[in-house]
A protein has these predicted regions:
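P-loop NTPase motor module signature
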Residues: 1-346, 355, 376-377, 387, ...
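Structured, non-catalytic alpha/beta "coupling" segments that mediate domain-domain communication
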Residues: 56, 348-368
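A short, terminal or domain-edge coil/loop segment
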Residues: 367-375
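A short, surface-exposed interaction/processing loop segment used at functional sites
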Residues: 380-383
Length: 419
C-alpha cells in the first residue's frame, strides 16, 4: 500500500491494531507522506507500549540514505547492511565545467556509440518530458547522417511517468543484434526500476524538483542540481548486470560541492494538506516529532490557508471544524476538498468531481512529435472553450464518457491515456 493510505487508516485507528510489522521501503526518497508516517508510527509504537498492547515493529529499507540520521531519529535503532549484487562502475567526469548539459550528454553518447561494442546500452538522465523528447529527436536526426550509416544501429526510447504504458515497455526491451538502445529518462530510473542491458550511464547532474516559497504562497518546479546521494545512485545503474561506466557531464569539483543528501520534500512544499491530515489524527505539527522540522513561516502560512478554507477554527490553537474533518477524509489538496464539500450547495457536485479528477491526472494532451504536430493541435482545438481551461477539461471528459470506443477516442483525438 502507499504511505497515504496508511496515514488515512491512522485517522480511524490511532493504534493501527491490524498491523504487527510495517516495512517502509525507499525511505531515502523522503516524500512528505514518508516523513509524516515516520512520526505517526513512532507515536503508535509509544502508545502501544504505554497501553500494554502488542509491539509494532518497523523495518526501514533504503538503497542509499543518511543512516546515522535515521538511526538517531528512531531512538538509536540497530542498522543492518545487506550487500547488493552490483558490479564495478568506472566514473568519468568532465575536465571543464559544461555550459550546456544537453549538448554534453549527446556528445558523450555518440562518443560511446562509435567506440563501444553493439548491444551495450546507454541510460541518460534528464529533467523532464520536454527535454527527453527534444533529445530523442536530436538523436534520431543525427543517426540519419551519412557519417553514421553502416555503423551499429542506435535506437532511442523515452522513459518518464506520463508516458503511455506500452511506450514505457519499449524502454525495457533489450537491444537486438547489431543495435544499441539508449534510454533517455527522468529520475524515475534512479531507484524505482531496473533497466536490463544498461552498460553506460550519462548523468547530467540535474533534476526537476518542486519548491515552495512560503512568503509568496507559490509552488514552482525548478531544474536544480542533484545531491551526491543521487549521483551515486545514478552511477549504480551501470553496474546491475556487469561492469559498467558512468559519464558525468560535470567536474569532480562540482560533485564535491553538491549537497550530500536530497532536501526532504517536507522542507520545500505547501504544508496545508499535511497539517490537515495530522490534525485529523489528533496531532499538532508544532509538537510533532518530525525527522526534519519545517520552518515556522511555512507552518504559519499553512495554518492561515486552512483557516481561510474554514478547515480550522483559529490559527493560534488549531482545531478542526466539522468541514475540516470531512476535508481530511479526501486524499486531495485541501482546496479541492473544500470545493467538493461545498459543491452540493450549488448543485454541481457531478461536474466538480469530474473536474477535480481531470485536474488530478497528468497532462491530458499527448505531446505531438514533429510529424503530426499540426494534426494533433487541430484535434486539441476542437475542445477549446473560451470560458477557460476548466470548461475545456469538462468538455473533454464529457465526450470521453459518451464515447463507445474509449481507446479509439484517445487515439483519434491525440489524448493521453491518463484518464
Amino acid at each position: 500500500m502507499t504511505e497515504g493510505i496508511l496515514l488515512r487508516e491512522a485517522i480511524t485507528d490511532k493504534y493501527l491494531k491490524q498491523y504487527q510489522v510495517i516495512i517502509l521501503d525507499e525511505a531515502h526518497e523522503r516524500t512528505v507522506n514518508t516523513d509524516v508516517l515516520f512520526g505517526v508510527l513512532k507515536n503508535v509504537q509509544k502508545a502501544r507500549k504505554e497501553n500494554n498492547m502488542t509491539e509494532l515493529k518497523l523495518i526501514i529499507m533504503s538503497a542509499t540514505m543518511d543512516v546515522d540520521h535515521f538511526s538517531k531519529y528512531f531512538d538509536n535503532c540497530p542498522v543492518l547492511y545487506l550487500p547488493g549484487r552490483t558490479f564495478p562502475v568506472t566514473i568519468h567526469h568532465t575536465k571543464q565545467k559544461q555550459d550546456d548539459y544537453m549538448f554534453a550528454a549527446i556528445a558523450t553518447l555518440f562518443e560511446i556509440h562509435l567506440n563501444a561494442p553493439p548491444q551495450e546500452d546507454v541510460l541518460i538522465f534528464l529533467t523532464g518530458k520536454d527535454e527527453i523528447e527534444s533529445m530523442i529527436h536530436q538523436i534520431r536526426t543525427i543517426t540519419k547522417s551519412p557519417e553514421l550509416q553502416g555503423t551499429v544501429q542506435l535506437r532511442a526510447f523515452p522513459l518518464h511517468s506520463s508516458l503511455q504504458q506500452n511506450k514505457q515497455m519499449d524502454a525495457f526491451t533489450r537491444s537486438a543484434e547489431n543495435t544499441r538502445r539508449v534510454v533517455v529518462a527522468t529520475n524515475i530510473a534512479e531507484t524505482s526500476i531496473t533497466l536490463p542491458g544498461i552498460k553506460y550511464v550519462i548523468d547530467t547532474g540535474v533534476v526537476k524538483m518542486k519548491n515552495y516559497e512560503a512568503s509568496t504562497g507559490l509552488e514552482t518546479l525548478k531544474v536544480t542540481k542533484i545531491s551526491q546521494a543521487q549521483a551515486w545512485q545514478r552511477s549504480g545503474r551501470a553496474g546491475r548486470e556487469s561492469e559498467g561506466a558512468c559519464y558525468r557531464t560535470y567536474t569532480k569539483n562540482e560533485l564535491e560541492l553538491l549537497e550530500k543528501m536530497t532536501k526532504p520534500e517536507i522542507l520545500r512544499c505547501n504544508l496545508s494538506a499535511t497539517i490537515l491530515q495530522l490534525l485529523a489524527i489528533g496531532v499538532n505539527i508544532e509538537n510533532f516529532d518530525l525527522m526534519d522540522k519545517p520552518s515556522k513561516e511555512a507552518i504559519t502560512v499553512a495554518f492561515k490557508q486552512l483557516k481561510q478554507l474554514s478547515a480550522i477554527k483559529t490559527t493560534q490553537s488549531p482545531q478542526l471544524t466539522d468541514d475540516g474533518r470531512s476535508m481530511a477524509l479526501f486524499p486531495l489538496d485541501p482546496i479541492f476538498s473544500r470545493i467538493i464539500i461545498s459543491a452540493p450547495e450549488y448543485g454541481c457536485i457531478n461536474e466538480i468531481l469530474d473536474l477535480i479528477a481531470m485536474l488530478s491526472t497528468d497532462n491530458v494532451y499527448l505531446e505531438p512529435n514533429q510529424n503530426n504536430r499540426d494534426v494533433a493541435y487541430a484535434q486539441h482545438n476542437k475542445f477549446h472553450m473560451s470560458y477557460g481551461d476548466h470548461f475545456t477539461l469538462l468538455k473533454i471528459y464529457s465526450q470521453y464518457r459518451n464515447a463507445n470506443d474509449k481507446k479509439k477516442f484517445h487515439k483519434t483525438l491525440k489524448l493521453s491515456y491518463s484518464f
